[in-house]
Every structure is written in C-alpha cells, then in structure tokens.
Amino acid sequence: MGQKINPIGFRLGINRTWDSRWFADNAEYGQLLHEDLKMRKFVMSELKQAGISKVVIERPHKKCRVTIHSARPGLIIGRKGADIDKLRKKLSDMTNSETHLNIVEVRKPEVDATLVAQSIAQQLERRVAFRRAMKRAVQSAMRLGAEGIKITCAGRLGGAEIARTEWYREGRVPLHTLRADIDYGTAEAETAFGICGIKVWIFKGEILEHDPMASERRALEGDAQGPASRERDRGDRRRERDNA
C-alpha cells in the first residue's frame, strides 16, 4: 500500500500535519472547506511564477491566517508591499473572516517536491528533453542533502504517438517506512502534444520522534541536510586540515 498511497496523507499525525488547521461544526464545515479550496486554487494560479510550495490556512476565532510558502517571496510582496496588500484584499473577499497573510521563504527549493515538479513541468513546456530535466533535478536534490529522490513523467513524452511513463531514481525512497520524512509533489505540463503529469518523491531522512509538526519544523530550521551532505562537509574540512 505504501507504493500507491499519497505519502503525505499516509504520515498525517505521525510526522506530518494538515495544511488546513481549524475546527468547525457541521453547519459551517462545508462552507469553510470550499473557501480553503477556492483560496488555494486562486493563490496557485495567480502566483504561478512565485514558486508556491504550499498554502497553510489556520482559522483562529473569527479570523483567517493564510501562510504562503514560496521560493520567490519578493514577487508576492512587490515594491513597498503593494502587491501583498492587493492579494490580502482579494483573499478577504473570498471569506467572511478578517484575513492575515504571512509569506515564508523556501530556502532550498531543490529539495521541495512540489517546486521540483513545477520546475520540471515548466522545462517540458519549453521543450527541454524530459530525461535531461529529470536528471538535472535529481542531481540538484542529491547535491543539496536529499537522501533519495524518485521522479516519474507520464504522457506523450517527446511528442511520441503513444503515451508512456518514464522514471528516474537515485538514493533511497522508503515509502513503507512511516518514520521516513518523505516529501511528495505533483505538477502538470501543458505541452503542444497534450498534458504530461510529473510526480516527485524526496526522502530527507528519518524522524524518530512522534510529532506531527516535526517535518515542518525541520524544513523551517533548514535541517534538511542528509548524511551525504554531512559527509561532504566532513570531507571538505579534512582537505582543509591537510592543506594547512
């Protein structure tokens, strides 16, 4: 089952937490859920060039707090914060609550599965060879500390008459191990031959404590360095000592 299920949903409550963090009674639950979906869809389409990793929505008492994780926060904020004020007003119009907007920078987009998938999709739309795009993404992720990565591309790859699925993997991606910190993201590339689907799994190491917030806290602290990265750091320090 670990091979088939969404790795993030599989680990909810273990080392991952929900992107919508609020409670509601039955009367207003459906309305709030639709508001969340509407806001997420709007942000992802409106800020396509800003590299949106995820949108977290929290609802304290009669308020709505939206946190956007982005690789390019400057594009969202705009000159002197003009763009972020417009975005806050548009989001406020979608909900009846007072809306607060936070922007969080993704410091390592190369090891964020959603951003990697979006990057490959953009390259396919620019007619870059899919194998080259996949290999480049894998090498960048492994260089920046990922312990393993798997990428699949499906569709009429290279303009072929028959659709097929191609995949590339490097390192370990243990989908059955619940303590594994696995990031998962998808994207669609709208090419001249049709839509190609991209899926990305990135293994960032193991989280031994039972804490639903552990994965997010680890990403925010920039503690995504795997053993390969630490080994390279040790090798660099060893060479510096030898040269000295």
From Swiss-Prot:
- UniProt entry tagged with the keyword Cell division: no
Q: Does the keyword Ribosomal protein apply?
A: yes
Q: Which PROSITE patterns match?
A: KH_TYPE_2, RIBOSOMAL_S3
Q: GO:BP terms for this protein?
A: translation
What are the record keywords, sorted?
Answer: Ribonucleoprotein, Ribosomal protein, RNA-binding, rRNA-binding
Cellular component GO terms, alphabetical: cytosolic small ribosomal subunit
What Pfam families does the record point to? KH_2 (PF07650), Ribosomal_S3_C (PF00189)
Matching InterPro entries, A to Z?
KH_dom (IPR004087), KH_dom-like_a/b (IPR015946), KH_dom_type_2 (IPR004044), KH_sf_prok-type (IPR009019), Ribosomal_S3_C_sf (IPR036419), Ribosomal_uS3_bac-typ (IPR005704), Ribosomal_uS3_C (IPR001351), Ribosomal_uS3_CS (IPR018280)
Q: Where is the KH type-2 domain?
A: 39-107
PANTHER family (UniProt xref): 30S/40S RIBOSOMAL PROTEIN S3, SMALL RIBOSOMAL SUBUNIT PROTEIN US3C
Q: What does this protein do?
A: Binds the lower part of the 30S subunit head. Binds mRNA in the 70S ribosome, positioning it for translation.
Record-stated family: Belongs to the universal ribosomal protein uS3 family.
Identification of the protein by name: Small ribosomal subunit protein uS3
The species this protein was found in:
Rhizobium etli (strain ATCC 51251 / DSM 11541 / JCM 21823 / NBRC 15573 / CFN 42)
